[in-house]
């Protein structure tokens, strides 16, 4: 039996101060039900960064994984764009 494809998200690294961990902010646009206007919503995820390569301001892709700690359930897949 084939395992289903893991969910991936693209977001901005907001913090790289922890050892082998980065905080990634994912921003989505959602249509407001009453006013029919798009509203920005953001959520923060803790992601595992094995080589400590991501820096604050980088755009990264993260994927779901098994629980790695109390708050970490995502891992860094690739750095899409480096911070300037």
From Swiss-Prot:
Molecular function GO labels: rRNA binding; structural constituent of ribosome
InterPro entries: NA-bd_OB-fold (IPR012340), Ribosomal_uS17 (IPR000266), Ribosomal_uS17_bact/chlr (IPR019984), Ribosomal_uS17_CS (IPR019979)
GO biological process entries: translation
PROSITE patterns reported in the protein's UniProt record: RIBOSOMAL_S17
A GO CC term assigned to this protein in UniProt: cytosolic small ribosomal subunit
Alphabetized UniProt keyword annotations: Ribonucleoprotein, Ribosomal protein, RNA-binding, rRNA-binding
Function of the protein: One of the primary rRNA binding proteins, it binds specifically to the 5'-end of 16S ribosomal RNA.
Oligomeric and partner information: Part of the 30S ribosomal subunit.
Family (UniProt): Belongs to the universal ribosomal protein uS17 family.
Protein name in the entry: Small ribosomal subunit protein uS17
Origin species: Treponema pallidum (strain Nichols)
Lineage of producing organism: Bacteria, Pseudomonadati, Spirochaetota, Spirochaetia, Spirochaetales
